[in-house]
Structure formats: C-alpha cells, structure tokens
Amino acid sequence: MKLKQIELKNFRNYEDLKLDFHPNLNIFLGQNAQGKTNILEAIHFLALTRSHRTSHDKELICWSGQEMKVSGLVEKAHATVPLEVQLSSKGRIAKANHLKENRLADYIGQLKILMFAPENLELVKGSPATRRRFMDIELGQIHAVYLYDSMRYNRALKERNAYLKFDQAKIDKNFLTVLDEQLAEHGNKIMFERKTFIEKLEIHAKKIHEQLTHGLETLKITYNQNVKTDFSKELLSRQDHDIFRHQTTVGPHRDDLQFFINEINVADFGSQGQQRTVALSIKLAEIDLIFEETGEYPILLLDDVMSELDNHRQLDLIETSLGKTQTFITTTTLDHLKNLPENLSIFHVTDGTIEKEKE
C-alpha cells in the first residue's frame, strides 16, 4: 500500500496544495510552525476522517474557507483507489472510488496508517482513555466489524447513561435491562477483539523489544479487562449502583493496558528511555501485525520523533520500516538522521510553501 498523491483544499494553512510522493521515503524538512505536521495530519485525516491533534473540526479549515477537502490516490496490489474526505458545516463526507461511503466502517481501512509522534509516549504513561483509543484506532483499521461494534456500543452507552440521569423514581428497570442487553451484545465482541489483538501484538512487540535491548529486557503487555465475569450479569447486578451514580460503571469503556519490563511497571517505575523503547517496540510490532491480519503494510508517519531517539533506535526504526512501509518523516534538520537510503524525496517547508528537492 502506497500513497501516491495528496491534494489539500483549505486544510489548515494550505489553501490549495498537490503533492506527489516517493513510494519509499518522504522527508518534510523545515523549522517549527511552518506546516510540516499539517501534511502528516492531512494523511491521518484522509485515512481515519479524524485529526490526531484536535477534536475540533473547525480548526482544520483554513481561515479563508467555509469547507475543506483532502483527497489522495492510494496504490494497492491490484488497483489505484482514489479517496476523498470533505468537511463543512453540514458534516463530513467520505468517498472511495468516487462513491460516498454511508458508514465510516466501510471507509476506514482503505488507507492504513501508523502514526508515531512524541505524544505516543502517552500510550505508556498517559491516561487509560489514551490506551483505549489506541486499541480502537488500530483494530478499526484491521477489522471493519470492530469499528461497527465500537460505534454501536458507544451509541448504546450514551443512551444508557442518559437514561441513568433520570429521576430514580422514573427509571423502569425492565427498559434498563433492554439497554443492558444492547450494551452487552456489542461490548462482548469488543472485549474479545481487544484481547485477541493484544495477545498477537505482544508476541511481535516482545520479540522486537528483546532485539532493541540486546536481550536484557523482556516486555509484557497486560490487557486489563474491566468486565471480570459475565457482562450481562455484571450490568444487571450494578443497576442500583449505576442508578445512584448516574453512569455506567462497568464495561469495555473502562478497559486499560499495562506494560511491564522484567515484571516492573514501565509507567510507574520505568525511565523515559525505557518508555520510549516500549512505545517504539509497539509501533514496529504493529507494522508486521497489520500485514499479518490484512495482507497490506500500513503507511508510517513519523512526526518529529527522530530527534527524540538516539542513533541506535533511529537505525532500528529505519531498518525495520523501510522496505516494508512507505514512510513520511517531519524534521527540522537532517543532521540526526543517519543511514538514509538514496531513493527518497525531500520536501522543504517554509511558511506553508513546499518545494520538492530535485532527486
């Protein structure tokens, strides 16, 4: 899978931009606040119809416009697929092969991506919500049915929580049980998919982490499932408690992950270097896992992370990704990038203007 071309209309600081990409490596070079990250954000938006930087869609639209559009050409094994995502006051529209996709579950996965940015350290040391979002994004790209179940679960959860906010005397437990059944139906599928995904991810990540640490450290990933027994029974047993709390207190929306090195919790006791190595191991593991599950390698987006890694980790990242994935890197300098291949494209970014260096 390769992204051959991208076109932006009123996206961030780009009113009208069209870029053709190298199938191997693309580097965006420039000082901070010039628009480098916006390119990677646009690729992320094209793939997932969402930004990784903001939840406020209005921030994505150029100040001079009322709507924006990101389109691209994705080269797959047997076809080149045009993709397009439009955003306006009326909402978003996603198209594949010029046809509107009514369900996001049918669109997401057309362009598979892996984003590695400084904030990815939050996967290890951040909030449980960050780790749940990580599972949802990666599983949504691999299995469309997971995204469908996740959306249905969140809809049912929102409805149940809204009902729990009613006056206690007005709550009908028979109706609440109906909502419980809807929640359990999709929640059980989500938990099964998450458990399977983490088990497979751990196999790849453990092997990579041992290589990165020369066998000195053993990585373990634990999926802390909030539901301990039968989801339906737990919902039923907690009805009175949930009515009192006005919220649903059990379910996959409260799941979490933990990471251990040699049986030590990395979030609590690991050094920053160890946390970085764990995050890197997970990202590298995802490359092979996504290929294993879908038959396609994802596109790798590296947003200003090379300067965060020492030469050893840089080399591991480049050697593991190149040859498998099309890679996009943003950086302020090439000084810290070692052993770059010759077949690449370098784009110079200055105040929203992008010039491609002659190859």
Curated annotation (Swiss-Prot):
It is found in: Cytoplasm. GO terms for molecular function: ATP binding; single-stranded DNA binding. Keywords: ATP-binding, Cytoplasm, DNA damage, DNA repair, DNA replication, DNA-binding, Nucleotide-binding, SOS response. It holds the Pfam family SMC_N. One of its GO terms (biological process) is double-strand break repair. ATP binds at residues 30-37. Belongs to the RecF family. The RecF protein is involved in DNA metabolism; it is required for DNA replication and normal SOS inducibility. RecF binds preferentially to single-stranded, linear DNA. It also seems to bind ATP. This is DNA replication and repair protein RecF.
